[in-house]
Amino acid sequence: MKALLRNLAVVLFSTLLLTALVSAEEIAVIETKFGKIEIQFFEDKAPVHVKNFKDLANKGFYDGTIFHRVIPGFMIQGGDPNTKGDDRSTHGMGGPGYSIKAEFNDTPHKRGILSMARSQDPDSAGSQFFVVVKDSGFLDGQYTAFGKVLTGMAVADQIVNSPRDRRDNPNKRIEMKVKVINR
């Protein structure tokens, strides 16, 4: 009887462990001087954008970049490698050296949505992303939403309210470090 109970316990423990491993979800953690923003991905709605963001984060691409555009009542934007340098005139113009095709979906651009920045060309997204701090329905169907903030909107609010210049670039650098972890 003891052997049966022990075997049953081992099977139950193994099943629970396997279930936990299989159901582990990858999230992004954006670390700033104000705290952390945790992001859940929409892999079912924008798989290419999610993979691109994760790949860039895992390579350290975002580390040392800044939030270079902050507009109160709208969004915070980052992910430009040009922001690692001191020439503020180039902020907002950089990318990874390639573009990805838009994956517009039915996700509304409500507070906390993570979306991909782009130029006039819908298929010009690369590395720059933004977090919406106020519902912005005018973006729906025009920008690829690929995640949402799980925790850390208070951090995003601090970032968006930072003093900024006429180009909406914060006066003081708000650097980020981005990592992808299992949750």
Could you describe each region identified by the protein language model?
Residues N7, L12-R183:
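Cyclophilin-like peptidyl-prolyl cis-trans isomerases
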Residues M1-N7:
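Positively charged n-region of N-terminal signal peptides that target proteins for export
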